[in-house]
From Swiss-Prot:
The active site is at 8 (proton acceptor), 130 (proton donor). CDD domains: HisA. It comes from Chlorobium phaeobacteroides (strain DSM 266 / SMG 266 / 2430). InterPro entries: Aldolase_TIM (IPR013785), His_biosynth (IPR006062), HisA_bact_arch (IPR006063), Isoase_HisA-like (IPR044524), Isoase_HisA-like_bact (IPR023016), RibuloseP-bd_barrel (IPR011060). It catalyses: 1-(5-phospho-beta-D-ribosyl)-5-[(5-phospho-beta-D-ribosylamino)methylideneamino]imidazole-4-carboxamide = 5-[(5-phospho-1-deoxy-D-ribulos-1-ylimino)methylamino]-1-(5-phospho-beta-D-ribosyl)imidazole-4-carboxamide. This is 1-(5-phosphoribosyl)-5-[(5-phosphoribosylamino)methylideneamino] imidazole-4-carboxamide isomerase. Gene3D superfamilies: Aldolase class I (3.20.20.70). It is found in: Cytoplasm. GO terms for molecular function: 1-(5-phosphoribosyl)-5-[(5-phosphoribosylamino)methylideneamino]imidazole-4-carboxamide isomerase activity. The gene is hisA.
Amino acid sequence: MLIIPAIDIKDGRCVRLTRGDFNQQKIYLDNPCDMAIIWRKQNAKMLHVVDLDAALTGEMVNFLKIEQIVRELDIPLQVGGGIRSLDAVKRYLDIGVGRVVIGSAAVTNPGLIEEVLKIYRPSKIVVGIDAENGIPKIKGWTESCGMKDYELGLEMKQMGIERVVYTDISKDGMMQGFGYESTKRFAEMTGMKVTASGGVTSSDDLMKLVGLQQYGVDSVIIGKALYECNFPCQELWYNFEEDICIDHNFSTARKK
């Protein structure tokens, strides 16, 4: 089970939202690259980076911030947020991003998926499905899609998509556990590779996720729980990794 720390960028800074609500925003560090270095020092093998400004506007507002992270790190980035054109996909992959996540555009412009897959391998393109009660939400979770989450997944699979980042919106940022049943159901019904997202809070949640590997859930994106130092091993890293030279006394991190 691959654990992928999340970095959300808004106005150039590293933030976390609660259930995607921009009015419930918490700033953790001014420089997202510093946050990326911290997660790499804590043995991250991949990072999930989202340009929240781009998700709102469609403009790649934080492109240079993301490019800096790519340059500084030796692990792949998975990048999402407002990717609505072939040009946006190309710009990210050209700077060395490992794979891009296409969300709302997969619903509003499915032809983009076909266009992108004519040029890039499926391993480079991921579709993000954010669902509430089994119904995909798009455009910053403000609109509902006219199909079930698994129906959208199967449509993307037919086009050639192999992996989905599946987020249970009701759990995202709530620190109350992840959507076990919804994630299991989606993975079972689509037979796709699934990266779970939203609500993982504890080691117990991770152990439950391991039980879903048989259905194709092989990785998980974790945000707020890592930032709030919910995992005991993080204290060890903070206390003994003296070469982490960044001021990471953000939030409730318990660095002595």
